[in-house]
Structure formats: structure tokens, C-alpha cells
């Protein structure tokens, strides 16, 4: 079995995988299955040579991202995925810590553990809304601009993880959902990629802010 290596555009990491573990989904993308720190991961990468135009992704250095590592630290302290990303950016918005924590509390586990949109993504969207969102409901241009922004952020996350949906990222089925959160044990952190996912979401938001400076 021949081992193949592809360079992931996300964290500049190489994934080792055998030919039979690779699946060419479309002419545009290659999905790689690999293993990092004993965790199975999915990384969706551009199949550049088959495209005349490819979407240019952000260059991320998650390990050295201030907000990324702050979000990861919060998650390891017990905050849920949405809270971890949202609270990591507390220095960017004017909101009481308790209120910010409560506001973002419903989105953990893919919306109250429904395993829908990843909580890290929801937290990223909330930060984007506070920093760049519109406050005039009839302003069509601002609304369109903000939705485009959200879709861009979602695209950055999806390109790196194959999906923005919790159950798909974690490889879960569509069985009965349980509202009881998992105990944060050593085993939990060993099998879940969530600490790295919140770090990635926060790093994406950090890079977006760097590329799109806030006024004032």
C-alpha cells in the first residue's frame, strides 16, 4: 500500500494517508482522512491542478494565534465551544462577561447539543455580528455585505474541516440527541477534536479582523 502525502492549506500540516483512504469527491476537491495525535480528522483541500480558478484561503498559524489559543484554553476550562470562541474576543466588544457567557451558552454542541451548526462556528458568527454587523433592518446593502462576510467565514472553516455541521465533523449519526453534555474527562479530550476546532475558528476570526481592520 503506497503512502501519499498532501499538503493541507489550513494549518500547513502534512497528512499521511494510504490510497484507499482517499476519496476524490469532485474535480474541485480532495478529501483526506488522516490521523493527528491519535484523532481521526477530515481535511478538505483544493485540488488545485483541476481548477482554473481556486479560492484563496487565509494563511493561518493556529498554534501562534493569540485568540485561537485563548479560545482553546477556555474550552479546556469547561466552557462550551460557542462560549470559548465568543469569550476569547471579549476585549473587542463592550459586554459584561456574565452576559456574554449566557448569550453564547445555547449554541454549544451544535445548537444545544442538537449536533447542527458547529458551536465554534456560531461563536465566530456572533463575534462577526458584534464587530461588523448592521443595525438598520432596511439597509439592504449592509445586510447583503454582512451575509457575504458570514458566508466567507463559514467557507474558511468548511474548507479546513469538510463541514460546518457538528455531527458531520465529529462523524456522528442522526440518532436520538441527548441534552446531557459529556463529562470533561481526560478520555473526552483525547477523542474529541473540539479544542483544536475552537482554536481554528477563533484564528479564522482573528485573521479576518487583521485583514479587515475595525474603524476607530
Where is each model-derived feature located?
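N-terminal amphipathic/hydrophobic targeting modules at extreme N-termini
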Residues: 5-7, 20-24, 30-33, 40-43, ...
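Amphipathic alpha-helical interface segments
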Residues: 87-91, 127, 140-216
Amino acid at each position: 500500500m503506497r503512502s501519499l502525502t498532501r499538503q493541507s492549506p489550513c494549518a500547513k500540516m502534512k497528512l499521511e494517508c494510504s490510497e484507499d483512504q482517499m476519496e476524490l469527491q469532485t474535480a474541485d476537491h480532495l478529501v483526506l482522512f488522516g490521523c493527528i495525535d491519535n484523532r481521526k480528522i477530515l481535511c478538505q483541500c483544493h485540488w488545485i491542478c483541476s481548477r482554473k480558478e481556486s479560492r484563496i484561503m487565509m494563511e493561518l498559524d493556529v498554534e501562534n494565534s493569540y485568540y485561537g489559543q485563548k479560545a482553546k484554553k477556555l474550552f479546556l476550562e469547561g466552557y462550551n465551544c460557542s462560549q470559548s470562541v465568543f469569550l476569547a474576543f471579549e476585549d473587542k466588544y463592550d459586554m459584561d462577561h456574565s452576559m456574554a457567557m449566557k448569550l453564547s451558552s445555547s449554541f454549544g454542541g451544535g445548537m444545544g447539543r442538537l449536533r447542527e451548526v458547529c458551536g465554534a462556528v456560531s461563536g465566530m458568527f456572533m463575534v462577526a455580528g458584534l464587530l461588523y454587523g448592521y443595525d438598520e433592518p432596511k439597509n439592504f446593502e449592509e445586510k447583503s455585505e454582512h451575509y457575504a462576510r458570514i458566508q466567507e467565514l463559514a467557507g474558511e472553516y468548511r474548507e479546513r474541516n469538510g463541514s460546518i455541521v457538528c455531527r458531520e465533523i465529529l462523524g456522528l449519526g442522526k440518532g436520538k440527541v441527548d441534552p446531557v453534555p459529556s463529562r470533561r474527562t481526560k478520555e473526552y479530550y483525547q477523542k474529541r477534536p473540539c479544542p483544536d476546532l475552537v482554536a481554528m475558528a477563533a484564528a479564522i476570526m482573528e485573521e479576518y479582523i487583521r485583514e479587515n481592520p475595525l474603524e476607530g
